[in-house]
């Protein structure tokens, strides 16, 4: 693994997080064959990517896999705010996808996009938990109030704010 070389560690000291999907079976086998550990998640790919920015706390060194473009852009925006790195490529594996890409003005169908290609300028990301996840608690309904947990990231300031909200019921 290139990451192990860059960090100056044995591949056995690297942990890759991968979304547990049939399309990733060959990728999981390849990472394991290289000697790295694999942790599989059933959902939460954006949170998984965010975890790579603090490997000392999360034990996750990199996130690998394919997914939808909107999630990729959201993850890139969060990584811009917290100082991570990310690369992505469009998967244009059908004639229809290639046609749609051409209609949107994409000329280089094999281009590798970096973090600033995916999320440029002063980026602000706000995410509120709906259901419990690894990154945020879900909405809690109490008799007189509703509790929420939100993360707000800003690239220009380099800040991450965790907001625990209390919303009184019955107000319009």
Task: Report each predicted region and the residues it spans.
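A general structural motif
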Residues: 11-13, 59, 120-122
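Acidic beta-strand-loop-alpha-helix segment within the catalytic core
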Residues: 1-40, 133-134, 140, 146-171
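Anaerobic metallocofactor- and corrinoid-dependent redox/one-carbon enzyme cores
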Residues: 63, 68, 80-172
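Conserved mixed alpha/beta catalytic, RNA-binding, or beta-rich assembly cores of soluble enzyme
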Residues: 1-9, 18-99
């Amino acid at each position: 693994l290139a990451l192990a070389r860059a960090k100056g560690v044995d591949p056995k000291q690297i942990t890759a997080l991968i979304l547990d999907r049939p399309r990733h079976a060959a990728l999981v086998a390849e990472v394991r064959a290289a000697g790295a550990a694999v942790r599989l998640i059933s959902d939460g790919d954006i949170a998984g990517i965010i975890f790579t920015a603090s490997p000392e706390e999360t034990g996750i060194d990199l996130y690998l896999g394919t997914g939808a473009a909107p999630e990729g852009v959201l993850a890139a925006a969060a990584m811009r705010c917290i100082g991570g790195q990310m690369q992505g490529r469009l998967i244009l594996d059908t004639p229809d996808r290639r046609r749609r890409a051409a209609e949107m003005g994409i000329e280089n169908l094999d281009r590798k996009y970096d973090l600033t290609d995916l999320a440029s300028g002063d980026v602000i990301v706000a995410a509120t938990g709906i259901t419990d996840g690894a990154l945020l608690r879900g909405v809690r309904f109490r008799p007189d109030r509703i509790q929420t947990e939100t993360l707000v990231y800003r690239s220009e300031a380099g800040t991450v704010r965790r907001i625990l909200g209390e919303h009184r019921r019955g107000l319009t």
